[in-house]
Structure formats: structure tokens, C-alpha cells
Amino acid sequence: MRMKRATRAALLCAGVSAFAVPALAYAQAGSENSTSDIVVTATRRAENLKDVAMSVNVATGEQLEKFNIFDVKDVQQLAPGLELTNTTGRNNTTTLRGITFDPDQGTDPAVQLYYNEIPTDAQTAFTAIYDIEQIEVLRGPQGLLRGISAPAGSITIRTRRPNFDQIEGYGQATATDRGGYNVQLGTTLPFNENLSLRVAGLVDGNRINHVYNIPRDKRSYGQTQSARVTLGWRPTENLTTYLTYQYLQADNNQYTQSFGPGNTPFSAVPVATLAGIFIPDTTVRSGPPLSATDYASVQEGGFRTRNRTHLINLAADLDLGWSTLSFVGAHQYSKLQTNRDLDTTNAIPGYIQYSNVVTPYKVDTGELRLQSNNDEGLGWGVGAFYSRQTGTTTVNQDASQFWYAAAPGSFNPVPGCILDPTAPCDTLTPFPIPNTLAIRTLVDVPVNVKTASFSANLRYKGGGLTVEGGLRYTIRKQVDSTILTLVGDVNSGPEEIIPASLRRSTDKPLTGGLSVNYALTDDLNVYAAYGHSFRSGSTGVSVPAGVSSDLIRTDPEKTDSYEVGLKGSVFDRKVNFTVAAFYQKFDGFLSRFTGIFYNCPDFGDGTCALGAPPIDNATDVPATNGGFDFNYNAPAKVKGIEVTIDARPTPNWDLNIAASYARARFSNALVPCNDFAGTGTPNQDGTPRITGTGNVSFCRTNGRLAEAPDFGLTANTELRFPMGDYTPFIRGLLAYRPGFYSERVQYDYRSREQINLFVGLRGPESKWELTGFVRNLLNQKRISNIAGGEGQVNALLGSTFNSGYRSVNVTVPREFGITANVKW
């Protein structure tokens, strides 16, 4: 029998939109009983929304302020089919049209984010939302008009820029009954008609997930400070430049919520250990029984994440008459730090499994474009894009192992062959040894990614017909490395654990699209669009040594999408509507499967090692070495329909309803899973073990790509009651999310009806506004995300620590607040 030690691989930290539907942009107090045109830059030129041949959601900065959108997780209330989550406090996950992305998978995102037209990461842009001009959500594959190809869509965020003719600005302050506050302001200071400055700032604090940590007697809490300065320079009528600097500092302590009865994880080790007899030690519990509504954590250690970012952005436009030459460039330096206890459910009471991860990185980006200025006839555009990201993630993490599922500080006898290879394994040592085998893991992960692309597109517009298409050729090079060192009772390294053949990758995809838009009447457009996108695969960070190549490196992903739509206005433009239907097919969808138990080769000491004897899932003890988050390719298909209706029935009533249906499924895919019971379907019944002959279990699935329902609906309205110079108003916001069953985590999620209500008074000329509000009016406390099983840690000699808890995220409880807003 081969004795093995369970080891834990380092889990690294890699690295919105209030896009409401169009109605939000219409909801301006006024006397006209009709909606107004919305101008978007989805196609890199200013166009009316109805003339754009794709499904686009829009929100202005004013709407973000009106609906108190301070947190990225609140944005999904404004756009059906969009899921924005941060389940761990250290990674923002975006899902659109049922297509999800986890930042830790190391690929380009499924939904690419652009901040002032420069690609950036969600950790930077979503952390501080303030002084925003407009946010646009572009649905469907994006492989032509912007530098990074994305299969699900793009989100563009444009901050407010200074004007050159008047002093103007705003200030807003919010406080809630649950310790939350948000203060933001922005103002423009023009020096003359050629030079102007805009200054903006934010301070924010809140309880994040509202979880109380029982062992530490503390609540989750986060604080964010940010400042932004934009200098506008217009030396001539033909040249305009904007230089922006933003500083961001965020510090969050977000404890992991637990759900379940708890347990007595320790065993009292008797003399009959070799016979497999373990007597539970009922004197020590992982914690009390906890329901979802308790908002409680039993995590004995902390969970602190910090983000410090400097971002410089330059944009310049030179009008040459017949064309416009545009440049955007940026330099970003970020430092992310995560300090946490990996034993989030307290499977080992009295022991903190610390993990300290530091991720500094630099990103330099530049794009040069030249496009024709003519609106009618044949237009064209060409561009070149370059981006490089560098940095080295360092990990200092406890990877200690335990002989038995007993108290870490206890002393117990072990089989004689553990200390003396010549001794028999069926006898115990005559003396006890420490139950803890102390090991510290040190990991260095250098990152070097270069992307260069060249694009060309043609556009014809005339007689109500617009045809646009083009191609983008990309060269993407990436170098991956993971250097592992073990220190303590087991020493090894430093050692490169990624095979040499998988460390370097170069991809040269050709992406693009074609769209046709036709105006049937002045108020009715029909369109059809095709898009092709590509994402490079990735090499897993700190993967267990010796696992198969398919678990280390993923292949590239390709996708083709087809969309048809209708956009129009009726009843003298009192009602606008959009309808879009789409179908998308993935070749090798890049997905991430979290918490997957694995078995790796070793030399008999339980340490994963290259060149060690092969695994035997039938006889290895313990049967697994730990859990890890693996990236994997799989075929998939997506199909659906999106509908929006926005209206202004009267001059003082705005109404919007939007719905999205997206059925995103794997296509008979074989994917990593936990199958302890050997049923061929995901389960965590009993002691962790591997089904089959591979390093992990595999399950055949036609399940969801994301932990999200197929259907989503949002609605919002504002009703105004003008009384001379003053206007009382009431606003409502509804987000409906039906329940669904998750095959991956074996859980039946309940439906959610999120209702936010706002009541307030607006002053003369809308110069000030005072609003009282309540979030989660119904006080629903529903599980929004749950782990696949109870927190467990395998001991070396066959027993298991079981916490009796599953990690969960629960919708935040009802919260009352007040907001004051002034404009000048």
C-alpha cells in the first residue's frame, strides 16, 4: 500500500455597467411626451442606438446616481441576462448571455471591459464607480472593432471629461442604516477655451456581504478611496486631447459565510488505528448550526484583500477633414494583496491555514486608428493595437498535512514504515509523533503577455441600408512559469512544475464580423449580424505536479455567432422597443471547474512530483491529494432572445421592462467533476475519491455554462409630481431571477425578486435632490452561490476532517438609506 500525503496547491489571485436598458437614458424630467435619441459609440463612432446592428444596453452617469449604483453587484438589477458576482472578495466574475468567466482562469475575459476605450480588468474598473459619463454593454462576440476579442460581449465605461466653456459639477452623499456610506463629486474648471480640468473623487464604505465572523467577533467591511484628474487640451479646432490620471485604493475584509449543521471534525485516535477505527472527539466543534439567514462565518483567520492602482490614460483625436486620426494609450500599475485563511469552513478547529498572495502587474496599451469621416456612401477604417502585461505573483502559503483527523497539536503513533522504510507498515511506532507535518509552500509565477493586432473595416450607408464588416489579425504571445519551493518538514525546490512544452504559446487568430442594418421606416430598423471571436488557452497557475497535460494547459477557444433583431418606435415615439434573437456555437469553450479533488503521482511520501510512479485510484491511500481549480475546454452552444420595451406614457412617467432568455449549455461534454460515489454525475457523497483512471474524475454533461438561470427580467419606473419649482417623485426598480437546479453543485436555487424603492424631492431646475430609499424591500435572504459540498481536508492515514458546512453567498438583507445630490 502506497502511503500518500494530501497536499494543497496554491490558489492564486490573478489578477458594468449600470447599463440599464435604453429607458434609463430617456428618463429625464421634461415636458415632452416622447423618448429622445440615444447616442452610442459601440461601433467606435457616434451613432443613434437604433442604427447599430447589435444588441446594446446603455446607461448614463445620471442614471447610476439616481439608482445609487455604487457596487458592481447592483448593476445586474438593470440588465437582464447579466450576472456580476464577487463570491470570494478577490475576484469579479461576469456572466452575459449565460456565458461566464472567472478571472483566475488566466485567459482573456468572456466579457471584455474597456475603460475610456482601453482594455482593463474588472478588479480595477468595477471597484470604484463614480463620475461616469456613459456605460454601454455590447452583447455578442466582439472580434473586430476593439483590441481584445471576446465571445460574450464588451462593456465600455467612459468617464466624464471637462468641457471648455463653463464651470459645472455635482456632489452626492449617501448613508445607510447598516453602516454604509458613499460620497462622490466631480467638477470642471475651465481655464480658457483651450484648456480645462476636471477633478473627481470617491470615498466609500460598506459591510460587503454583511457576514459576522463568530470566532473573530468582527463583521465584514470594506473601504474604497479614489481620485481622478482629467486635463483637456484643445489647441485648435481640429485637435483635442484628454490626459487622465486615476488613483484607487481599496481595502476589504470579507469573511466567508458558512451554512450547515457544523460537525465534530476531530477523531480520538485509538490503538486500533490500523484497523480503521476512529472514535469521534465530541468535545471540539467546527461551530454552531448555521442557516443562510444567520449571515455568519466560522473562519478563524482573516480574509483581507487590498488593491492599489495607478492608471494613466491619454486620448487624442485629430480631424484631418477627410478622416480622423485617433490615439488612445494607457499605463496601469496595480498591486493586489490577499491574506486569508484557506480553511474557510473551519474543518480543522484551532488551526489557521494562512495564504499570502501578492500580485503586482504593469499593463501598457496603445491603439492608433484612422477612419473616414463621411456618414453616407463608402466609409473605411484601419487600426493597430498593442498591449503588454508583466509582473510576478508570489505566494507564501501553509500546506501542512496531518497524519490523522485529530487535533493539530496532538501526538499519535503512526505505522512503523512511515519513519523507517524497512519496518513493517502493519505495526505502530512505539512512541507518538506530532500529528502535524509542517510544510510551507512558496510559489513564484512570472507573467509576460504580449498582444498585437491589426484591423480593417469597410462601411457602406445609403438609402436606409448600412452594411459593415471587417477583419482583425492578432498575434498573441504568452510565457508561463510556476516555480515551486517546499519548506519545513518536507523540503524541495525551487522547481519549475510546468512542462517545458507548455510554457510558451503563440496564437495568430483572424477574427471579425459582418452586419446589415436596414431602415424599413424612419421608426423601424431590422438588422442581421455575424461575429467570430477567439480566445487563447492558458496554462494553469500552480497546478499539481505530475497531472496530465489537458489539466495543465487549455486549447484555444473559437466561437461563431448569428443574430437578428428589430428596433423601433411606436405611438409617436412614446414607446421604443428592441427584439434580438441569437445563436452561438463554441469550439472548446474555456471554463473553470472549482474545488476539484485530484490524485497525483508521488514517490511514496505523498508529495506530487514529476517522474514519480503512476497513480492507482483503486489502491492509493488517501485516495486524493487535495482540491484544485482546473481550467478545461468543452464544446458548447448558446441560443436565446432579448426584448426591451421603454416608454414615456406621460411627460412625467417613465417606464421600462426588459427580459432575456439565454440557454447556454455544454454539448455532451466530458469535464472535470467530483464524483465520490462513482455515479458518473457530480456528487460529494462520502470520502473524497477519484472515479476512473485519470488524475480527476470526469462527468458527461449537457449542463449550464454558468451558475445562472436561463431567464431574467428587469423593470424600472419613475413617476414625477411637479408642484411649481419643486418635483416630488417615486422610483422603483425590480430584478426578477427565477429559481433553477444546478447540476454542478447539486443545489436547487430559489427564485429572487429584488425590489428597490426610492422616494424623494427635486429642487428648482433639478439643482438638488433629496432621496430616501430601501434596498431589498421584501427582505429576501436567498442563497445566490453555494459550494459543491461540505468543507473537507483529507488526513494522510485515511481519515477526513469534515466541517459540516458549505460555503455560501446570500443576498444582502434589507437596507434603508438617504441620498443628497447637488449640481452646479
Residue ranges of predicted features:
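N-terminal Sec signal peptide and the immediately downstream disordered periplasmic leader
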Residues: 1-67, 73-78, 188, 237-238, ...
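Acidic, small-polar-rich N-terminal luminal/periplasmic segments of exported/outer-membrane proteins
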Residues: 35-164, 564
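Outer-membrane beta-barrel translocator/receptor signature
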Residues: 109-110, 122, 130-133, 139, ...
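Periplasmic-side early beta-strands and strand-to-turn transitions of outer-membrane beta-barrels
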Residues: 156, 164-166, 172-174, 186-285, ...
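Structural signature of Gram-negative outer-membrane beta-barrels, strongest in the C-terminal barrel
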Residues: 232-236, 370-373, 379, 383-387, ...
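Membrane-embedded beta-barrel scaffold of Gram-negative outer-membrane proteins
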Residues: 313-319, 324-340, 519, 525-531, ...
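Gram-negative outer-membrane beta-barrel transporters
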Residues: 371-381, 385, 461-467, 583-585, ...
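C-terminal beta-signal and adjacent terminal beta-strands/loops
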Residues: 585-587, 594, 735-741, 761-824
